[in-house]
Amino acid sequence: MGKKIKITLVKSTIGRKPKHVAIAKQLGLGKTNSSVVHSDTPAIRGLVNEINYLLLVEESA
């Protein structure tokens, strides 16, 4: 199995660029402090890097 990353939305998307709000929704993050676990793939990392100022990313086994 591949690595997993836990992504938590720590800042609100209110007032952010529409593209950044859409990326948060694509990742499955709706409200502040919501978390999701995704596989650590280049595609997911690319989305995370776009909105890294809104997120907390933790690696898990």
Curated annotation (Swiss-Prot):
Domain of life: Bacteria
InterPro entries, alphabetized: Ribo_uL30_ferredoxin-like_sf (IPR036919), Ribosomal_uL30_bac-type (IPR005996), Ribosomal_uL30_ferredoxin-like (IPR016082)
Ribonucleoprotein as UniProt keyword: yes
Cellular component, GO annotation: cytosolic large ribosomal subunit
GO BP of this protein: translation
HAMAP family noted in UniProt: Ribosomal_uL30_B (MF_01371_B)
Complexes and interactors: Part of the 50S ribosomal subunit.
Protein name: Large ribosomal subunit protein uL30
